[in-house]
Structure formats: C-alpha cells, structure tokens
Amino acid sequence: MGIAARLEKDRIIGLILPTGALHRSALHLDSTGRRVLSRLLAEGVLRSRWNVVHLPDADPAVIAARRLRGLLTCTSALARYGLPDILPVGVPHVAVPANRGRLDPKGVVVHREPGLVVGGELFVPPERLLARLLRCGPEKETIAIVDSALNHHLVTREEIAALLTGKGNDCPRARRRLGRCTERARSSIESIARIELQDAGHLVESGVMVPGVGELDNFVDRILDLETDGFAHHSSYSAWMRDRQRDQALLARGLLPLRLTYDDVMAGRTVSLVEAALAGFGRRN
C-alpha cells in the first residue's frame, strides 16, 4: 500500500471511529478512497450495509440514523445527555426533516421534525429531544425526564416551549405536560411520586423550604413531607442521623414525615402509602 493509500485509510477510519458508522456519501471518496474502502471491507476491518460504512461492532441505532441521514432522538438519545434511563430503549428512534420523502424502514421509529437541520451530528439537540418525548412519550416518565433536564440546566422551559407551538402534532398535550414539569425535582422517583399524587387529587409542592428543617422533596397537602430516599445517599451514619433529626424537627412543627424507598415508588405504592399515613395522622390529631 502506497503512501497515498495509507493516508486515505487513516482518513476513512478516523472519520468513522468517533460514532462507529457514517453514510458512504459523508466519506467523500475519490478513486483512491474507493479502492482503499473496498480493501477495508474485504479485510473485515469495516462493513457496509444500506450505504452505511461501519465498524463490525457499531451500535445498530447509529447505523439506523446514518442510513436515514437523520439524528437519534427519544429513548435513543437519553444516555447522550445523561437523562434518566426510565424508559425501555427498544428499537432506534430517528428524527428526519419533516419534508423528507417517503420512508418506511423496518425496525426503526421515524419522527418527522419541522425545522430540523441534519449536519454531521448524531443526536438531536436536547430541547428537540424533550419536545418530542412530551408529544408522544408516556406521561409520568416523560415529565420525570424533563424535570431532570430542567434541574440540571440542560435546557430551559422556554427552549422546549418554542418547539411546541400550534394546535397540531400533539402540541397542546405536550404544552400541558410541560406545565406539570418543575426544575425543583432532584430525582426521577421524586418526580414520579409527585405526578402520581397529583393525579390522585393531592396538592403537591416540590422543593418547599421549611425554616429549621430545610428543603422538602414533595410537600403533600401542606402537611406531609414525602421523602423518596435512595440508599446511596442515605446509607452513611451521618446521613442516617440527619434524617432522624429532620423528622423530629418536622414533627415538632406539626408536619408528618414519610420516607419511601425506590422500590415503593416504582412498584406504584406511593398513593396508598401516603393516603394511609395522612388518614392515621388525621385520626391522631
């Protein structure tokens, strides 16, 4: 292999390595490049399918996005932005411009996005990802994911809302869901507990500050502090002591502390446990 061919080999592999796959057109091959690529394919260094050149172990979702010349979105892009993985990943979700011609790829969910510009990126911007989830994702989990994005300042509420204008494309439902989101929720289980309690008719305020106590996860019906405790943050002796002192301070103020585990929330026991605690507290008072 001559110098020009070796340089071209390095260029091709260097372009593909960051994501594992590229559409053949993105390689901009000349006659030397085509010969080098043929050799790489014959040697098994690279593979090609649907005009996508990829590494042997490339992520199928990336291959799907490159095949459609689109961007990964929805559950296929949550990990990219460090958002909660509380939705099943399933088949790849790919966003394409709304005016793209007919597409019917098997094993891929295609989302047509007005105003989407596809460049060299692999993922949609976070605000577009969240706007799409608000339109078509399951309500509880989607709100929890948006809560997390707002809490970590990944996006602003206004950036998401700008993509949800008009009456079509499920935008009214998405705007209603966005209105239920809050930047004050600090975990997905905290968000899910809040949503379930609101759906059951309870008043729930997130991140309320109580003098002498601190910030409450979820303040229910202005009387119960619902804490959703993850073991990792409450397992040390000092954390255990702080939790008990906090509960004592709440009780001294006539407020009821209730601590639920991750399993309590994810098993759907939040409403029944909270309502039982409220009923018992009411009988004693």
Name the predicted role of every residue range.
Residues 32, 150-285:
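Surface segments flanking catalytic/ligand-binding clefts of nucleic-acid enzymes
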